[in-house]
Amino acid sequence: MIQITFLAFALFLAIEGAIVVFWPAWAKKKMADMQGVPDRALGVIGLLFIASGLVVAGLTDGIIKIAAVAVALEGTLYGFLPTLMKRLMAAAVQCSESMLKVWGETALGIGAAALALFY
């Protein structure tokens, strides 16, 4: 289970990094839009991500299981730390697109390397 969680975290980094690298303007717009969502609503959505991710992970195997655990991990961030996530997104909105792309490339590189090494 630890390996699946590690691979899910690597997949999460790779996906989120790819989104920011290839579509930085869209990512900034979505992060700015998230500032208007109440913390409680973000927490409930996070808990739904956790529940759905764990149900799918229990029913599947292989890469789908890893992807489902990645959804549950993202739900954990939004479900239990909504204020922190909004604060991080607010900081990302304030930075330039080139800086955002650097952070995205870093996340994509770490995630892709971990997936290549450990899957």
How should these model regions be labeled?
Residues 1-5:
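Feature marks short, highly hydrophobic, charge-poor N-terminal signal-anchor/signal peptide-like helices
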Residues 6-8, 27-38, 67, 88-93:
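Short juxtamembrane and helix-loop transition motifs at transmembrane-helix boundaries
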Residues 113-119:
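Juxtamembrane boundary at the C-terminal end of a transmembrane helix
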Residues 8-28, 74-75:
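N-terminal signal-anchor/start-transfer transmembrane helix
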Residues 56-79:
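Short alpha-helical packing/oligomerization segments
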Residues 43-54, 104-111:
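Core segments of transmembrane alpha-helices
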Residues 23-30, 76-90:
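Transmembrane alpha-helical segments of integral membrane proteins
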Residues 83-106:
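Interfacial loop-to-transmembrane junctions
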